[in-house]
C-alpha cells in the first residue's frame, strides 16, 4: 500500500486543487473552487487533498454535516476525484484512508454522492466498487436519464401537439441573460409546489460571472413575454438542465 497523506484544503491551495480537477478522470467544473466557493458561507468546508510522493493523486470535496461529513450537499454530486491512470486498488486505499482521516477528526460517518459516469472524461466506477468492498451502505438512488446527440427517438404525440401550438402562437426560443424574468417565473412555478429556488438570483448572476461559458439560459417568449425557460449547466461531456 502506498503511503498516503490527507491534507485539509485551505484557500492557498486553490490553484493546485483546480489544476488537478481539470485533468482528473471524473472531476467537473462544479468541483472547481470558483463554483464550490460561491456559497462557502453555507458550508463548513472539510475538503481534503490526497498526497503521495509530494503529488496530488486525489481530491475530496466535502463539508461537515451534523456528526458526519458529506460529499457534497452544495454540489449536484461529489465523491473522490482521481487521476486517469490510477488503479481501482488505489482508489480503494484513498477511500479507506479518508474514512480513517475523518474518524480521527471526530466524525462518525461519510455521506457520499458519486459523479455519474456520463460526466466522466474517462468513465469508470472504481469508487463504487471500492465503497462496496468497504461495506458502505446504499441509502438513496436518484433517477436520471440521458438524451443522445442524435435525438431521443420517437417523439410523443403530446410533445408534437405542444410544438405545433408553440409555432401557431409564434413562440420564439432565445438564449440570453434575462435572469430577473427567469427568476420571477421560477419562483412562481415552485410556489405551486410549496418550494423555493435552491439558488438566489444574486448567486445565479455570480456563477454566470465566474464561469460564463458554463451556464446558459434559454427561454421561450410569446409576444416578448417569457413563458418557459431552462438554466443549463455545460459540462465537458454533457448538458444538464438544472432548472426546467
Please place each PLM-identified region on the residue numbering.
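A conserved beta-strand-loop-helix scaffold within acyl/acetyltransferase catalytic domains
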Residues: 3-68, 114-244
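N-terminal, well-ordered alpha-helical segments
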Residues: 46-48, 58, 78, 96, ...
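Conserved acyl-donor/pantetheine-binding loop and adjacent beta-alpha core of acyl/acetyltransferases
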Residues: 66-79
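A short, internal acetyl-CoA/4′-phosphopantetheine-binding micro-motif in the GNAT/acyltransferase core
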Residues: 76-88, 244
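Glycine-rich, often proline-containing surface loops adjacent to acidic residues and nearby aromatics
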Residues: 76-77, 107-110, 141
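Conserved acyl-CoA
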Residues: 92-108
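Conserved GNAT acetyl-CoA-binding A-motif
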Residues: 105-117
Amino acid at each position: 500500500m502506498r503511503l498516503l497523506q490527507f491534507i485539509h484544503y485551505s484557500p492557498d491551495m486553490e490553484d493546485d486543487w483546480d489544476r488537478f480537477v481539470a485533468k482528473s478522470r471524473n472531476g467537473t467544473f462544479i468541483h472547481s473552487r470558483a463554483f464550490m466557493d460561491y456559497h462557502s458561507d453555507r458550508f463548513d468546508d472539510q475538503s481534503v487533498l490526497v498526497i503521495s510522493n509530494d503529488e496530488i493523486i486525489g481530491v475530496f470535496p466535502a463539508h461537515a454535516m451534523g456528526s458526519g461529513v458529506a460529499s457534497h450537499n452544495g454540489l449536484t454530486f461529489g465523491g473522490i476525484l482521481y487521476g486517469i491512470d490510477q488503479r481501482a486498488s488505489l482508489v480503494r486505499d484513498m477511500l479507506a484512508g479518508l474514512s480513517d482521516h475523518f474518524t480521527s477528526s471526530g466524525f462518525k460517518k461519510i455521506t457520499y454522492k458519486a459523479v455519474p459516469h456520463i460526466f466522466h472524461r474517462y468513465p469508470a466506477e472504481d469508487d463504487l466498487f471500492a465503497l462496496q468492498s468497504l461495506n458502505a451502505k446504499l441509502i438513496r438512488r436518484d433517477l436520471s436519464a440521458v438524451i443522445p446527440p442524435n435525438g431521443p427517438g420517437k417523439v410523443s404525440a403530446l410533445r408534437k401537439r405542444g410544438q405545433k401550438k408553440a409555432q401557431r402562437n409564434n413562440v420564439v426560443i432565445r438564449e440570453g441573460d434575462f435572469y430577473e424574468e427567469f427568476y420571477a417565473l421560477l419562483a412562481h412555478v415552485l410556489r405551486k409546489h410549496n418550494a423555493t429556488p435552491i439558488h438566489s438570483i444574486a448567486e445565479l448572476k455570480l456563477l454566470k460571472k465566474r464561469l460564463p461559458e458554463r451556464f446558459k439560459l434559454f427561454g421561450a417568449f410569446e409576444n416578448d413575454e417569457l413563458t418557459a425557460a431552462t438554466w443549463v449547466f455545460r459540462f465537458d461531456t454533457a448538458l444538464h438542465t438544472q432548472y426546467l
